């Protein structure tokens, strides 16, 4: 009986391993992932990545901010923070997304319901705060804490 149970266990383990090898791809290929199907395809190396960050008490200026990092390996600043744009306060920074032309980055917040719009096109290394939507909760009929922004055509 013990041998039969052992054989059953070994068989189960072998079948699990076989199925894992057959069903799980060993190479994964992907194309550019975009926020919107209407967004222009990114061609070539990105120069910067924008990180929408939370302000924290006792750290820096304690404000939410958009941080710019150089990501082009050819840049002498590769892998370094090259700038940041504070938004004046802590709003529980959350998700962000590009407009379909990638000229603006919309950054949502949870606590205040504000939406910050950054111009990342005029000078990509030094984004500027373009506009702040402060009445989203009222204008949307009471929706609080927009989670994700999404670019639609037009």
Regions of interest found by a model, annotated:
Residues 9-27:
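Bacterial N-terminal signal peptides
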Residues 112-114:
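Loop/turn residues immediately N-terminal
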Residues 57-60, 76, 124, 141:
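Short glycine/serine/proline-enriched coil/turn segments at secondary-structure junctions
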Residues 1-11:
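N-terminal secretory signal peptides that target proteins for export/translocation
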Residues 3-4, 24, 93, 109:
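Intrinsically disordered, low-complexity Ser/Thr- and Pro-rich stretches
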Residues 120-154:
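Asp-box/WD-like beta-propeller blade repeats and closely related beta-sheet repeat scaffolds
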Residues 69-77, 117-127:
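Short loop/turn segments immediately following beta-strands, especially the blade-tip
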Residues 31-71, 78-110:
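Beta-strand-rich domains and repeat architectures in extracellular enzymes and scaffolds
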């Amino acid at each position: 009986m013990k041998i039969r149970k052992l054989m059953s266990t070994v068989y189960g383990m072998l079948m699990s391993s076989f199925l894992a090898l057959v069903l799980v791809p060993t190479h994964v290929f992907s194309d550019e992932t975009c926020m919107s199907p209407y967004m222009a395809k990114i061609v070539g190396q990105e120069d910067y990545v924008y990180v929408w960050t939370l302000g924290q008490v006792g750290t820096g200026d304690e404000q939410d901010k958009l941080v710019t990092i150089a990501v082009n390996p050819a840049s002498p600043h590769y892998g370094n923070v090259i700038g940041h744009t504070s938004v004046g306060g802590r709003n529980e920074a959350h998700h962000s997304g590009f407009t379909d032309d990638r000229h603006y980055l919309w950054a949502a917040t949870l606590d205040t319901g504000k939406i910050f719009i950054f111009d990342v096109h005029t000078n990509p290394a030094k984004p500027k705060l373009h506009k702040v939507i402060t009445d989203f909760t009222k204008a949307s009929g009471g929706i609080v804490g927009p989670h994700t922004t999404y670019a639609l055509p037009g």
